[in-house]
Amino acid sequence: MALVFSGCNMNNTTKGGLIGGAGGGALGAGIGAAIGALINGSSGAKLGAAIGAGVGVAGGTTAGVLIGRKMDKAKKEAEAIANAQVSDAVDQNGYQAVKVTFESGILFQSGKSVLSAAAQSSLNKFATDVLAANPDMNVGIVGYTDNDPWKGKTAEQSVAANQKLSEQRAQAVSNFLQKHGAAANQIQEVVGLGESNPVADNATAAGKQQNRRVEVYLYASDAMIEAAKQGTLQ
């Protein structure tokens, strides 16, 4: 799964047409390495190049528009979920996707991977109202932590512990979503990236809270892409 953030202020339907059409090559060249680096750390340049190439060859204007329309619908559905922060993304094929971020402070107690009651309520609604309603969308789940050290552990051990915690939290979210509406084959990838890719300054408590998060990506499955190319995607 290769996903990048999009900074455009147009809806996914419009962006889908631009990305799927002839303009994709230029857009891909502009966003690939720079944004990919934010996602994948030191290997972001390679990831970004792949993303950039994908944006340039996405399956045509019509397919991009149809997929963008589906993503707009899913985005609105996700925006109705409590504690969910929703934004746009672009998948490895250059099609529009949706990124949903849940702060781990809402999902979990500090240092734990057991979902809180409030988290279960939000994720249950997300599973039933968004994932189950869009079975032709693939899902990728990525867990992160802040860089707080663990008591009694060395710096290296703390990094490893945070990595493991991020994996456990991502898996906890995946397991819950599958039990409450998401199909098992809908969730394509579940990974933890530990302390990497902070979105805020770890020097402040507020920044640490933002960095403790689980991101859920919704992106077009092969079946959705094929239907879009055939013009039959509803």
Give residue ranges: language-model regions.
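Short, low-complexity, glycine-enriched hydrophobic/amphipathic alpha-helices that associate
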Residues: 9-79
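Periplasmic OmpA-like peptidoglycan-binding domain that tethers envelope proteins to the cell wall
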Residues: 145-227, 232-234
